[in-house]
């Protein structure tokens, strides 16, 4: 019986599954919005929420320890860790949780897998990127 098991295995070994969580987490932190399958988004949400909470709590108390802990969880991506500690930790300083949302977005063309958009709550909509002419 699978009582109390909170995560999916995705038919992958543990190391692959952990890197499969770390890579989209880094992309989500960098771009603040990603497109993925619904199952992966539901598994990614608690992982990212914990990262933001750790960054939020340790940004002021012990920034060196927080930076090292986040680097180990996020595959050593320093740019994403810096953004998490400098931008996202300040943005969600007074928010007790619930930093992400999952919006269902139809089905993938190739295999009809349900697709979702995962994004941070309270994110600023950026200016549209200008296309270089010429």
Swiss-Prot record:
GO biological process, one term: translation
InterPro entries: Ribosomal_bL17, Ribosomal_bL17_CS, Ribosomal_bL17_sf
Residues of the signal peptide: none
PROSITE patterns: RIBOSOMAL_L17
Gene Ontology molecular functions: structural constituent of ribosome
Example of a GO cellular component annotation carried by this entry: cytosolic large ribosomal subunit
SUPFAM superfamilies in UniProt: Prokaryotic ribosomal protein L17 (SSF64263)
Protein family (similarity comment): Belongs to the bacterial ribosomal protein bL17 family.
Protein name: Large ribosomal subunit protein bL17
Species this chain originates from: Anaplasma marginale (strain St. Maries)
């Amino acid at each position: 019986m699978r009582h109390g098991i909170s995560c999916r295995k995705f038919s992958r070994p543990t190391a692959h599954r952990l890197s499969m969580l770390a890579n989209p987490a880094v992309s989500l932190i960098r771009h603040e919005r990603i497109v993925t399958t619904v199952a992966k988004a539901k598994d990614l949400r608690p992982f990212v929420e914990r990262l933001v909470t750790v960054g939020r709590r340790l940004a002021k108390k012990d920034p060196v320890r927080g930076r090292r802990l986040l680097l180990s969880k996020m595959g050593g991506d320093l740019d994403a860790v810096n953004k998490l500690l400098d931008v996202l930790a300040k943005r969600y300083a007074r928010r007790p949780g619930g930093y992400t949302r999952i919006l269902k977005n139809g089905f993938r063309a190739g295999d009809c897998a349900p697709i979702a958009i995962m994004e941070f709550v309270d994110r600023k909509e950026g200016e549209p990127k200008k296309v270089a002419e010429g």
